């Protein structure tokens, strides 16, 4: 006989969604995810290392120390550092860059934290469906406090927020997504959806056993400002989608959408699949 707990039989599959867990930059706020990329470029420049925006975007979604470590492992970046300092960048060098990066990020993050169009309406629809809402970010908690202040001023509020320095291992490990599930009181991770604009964020959701949705045009993968996005014709948008899909290929999201405004129809499709006994 199955054992019942919180409305679920222990050997039963979920038949409806319970929660949606969002990334922040490039997903809910900061169209194009420019706040971290530009500050990475500026922080490395202070050590005599030239970074392009494209290079800075590469490891996006990771915790910021890990992001800097990944950048320093790039041969071209490492060789610049070695030429300047006479040695390859070790963990102490990464920490030094991070300590330069963090106050710069704290100072500038609010400038890039405007709410992405469609986010408020989508969150309202999600809550009207009776679903819980959580979130997580590659930002540390100190930076997230600034982001949340700006988001609240724009009418966006999410109570459950997990920062990268609040778990033992951040993305692509599943800890932040799973911490959300625990704090939200979710009974089955298969009844959760993770929405993100980075490959490691999508992988985080998959490793957590959740449905994963990749954002093609509002975030890091496309790297478009809101004005640039709006100026694209359909041919240009399809080209940007193709580039983003390629960037997400190894992460294998269950769904692709352009921006958060397109999420409600995906949630309806996932609920239909759950009702048919599918799992992520």
Swiss-Prot record:
GO biological process: DNA repair; organic phosphonate catabolic process
Residues annotated for Mg(2+) binding in this entry: 23, 25, 197
An MF annotation (GO) of this entry: phosphonoacetaldehyde hydrolase activity
Alphabetically ordered keywords of this record: Hydrolase, Magnesium, Metal-binding, Schiff base
A GO cellular-component term linked to this record: cytosol
SUPFAM superfamilies linked: HAD-like
Listed EC numbers: 3.11.1.1
Active site annotation, chain numbering: 23, 64
Textual note on the cofactor: Binds 1 Mg(2+) ion per subunit.
Domain of life: Bacteria
Reaction(s) this enzyme catalyzes, per UniProt: phosphonoacetaldehyde + H2O = acetaldehyde + phosphate + H(+)
Record Gene3D superfamilies: HAD superfamily/HAD-like, Putative phosphatase, domain 2
Coiled coil regions, renumbered to chain: none
Cofactor(s) this protein requires: Mg(2+)
Similarity remark: Belongs to the HAD-like hydrolase superfamily. PhnX family.
Subunit annotation: Homodimer.
Described function: Involved in phosphonate degradation.
Identification of the protein by name: Phosphonoacetaldehyde hydrolase
Organism the protein comes from: Bordetella avium (strain 197N)
């Amino acid at each position: 006989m199955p054992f019942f707990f919180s409305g679920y039989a222990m050997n039963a599959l979920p038949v409806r969604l319970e929660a949606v867990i969002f990334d922040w930059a490039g997903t809910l706020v900061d169209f194009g995810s420019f706040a971290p990329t530009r500050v990475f470029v500026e922080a490395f420049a202070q050590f005599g290392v030239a970074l392009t925006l494209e290079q800075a975007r590469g490891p996006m979604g990771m915790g910021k120390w890990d992001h800097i470590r990944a950048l320093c492992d790039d041969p071209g970046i490492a060789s610049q550092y070695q030429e300047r300092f006479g040695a390859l960048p070790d963990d102490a060098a990464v920490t030094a860059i991070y300590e330069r990066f963090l106050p710069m990020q704290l100072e500038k993050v609010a400038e890039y934290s405007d709410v992405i169009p469609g986010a408020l309406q989508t969150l309202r629809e999600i809550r009207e469906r009776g679903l819980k809402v959580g979130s997580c970010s590659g930002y540390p908690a100190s930076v997230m406090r600034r982001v949340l202040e700006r988001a609240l001023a724009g009418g966006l509020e999410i109570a459950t927020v997990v920062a990268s320095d609040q778990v033992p291992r951040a993305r692509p490990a599943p800890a932040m997504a799973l911490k959300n599930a625990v704090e939200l009181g979710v009974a089955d991770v298969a009844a959760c959806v993770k929405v993100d604009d980075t490959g490691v964020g999508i992988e985080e959701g998959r490793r957590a056993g959740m449905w994963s949705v990749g954002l093609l045009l509002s975030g890091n993968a496309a790297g478009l400002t809101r004005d640039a996005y709006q100026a694209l014709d359909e041919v240009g948008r399809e080209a940007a989608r193709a580039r983003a899909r390629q960037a997400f290929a190894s992460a294998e999201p269950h769904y692709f959408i352009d921006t958060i405004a397109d999420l409600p129809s995906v949630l309806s499709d996932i609920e239909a699949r759950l009702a048919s006994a599918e799992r992520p």
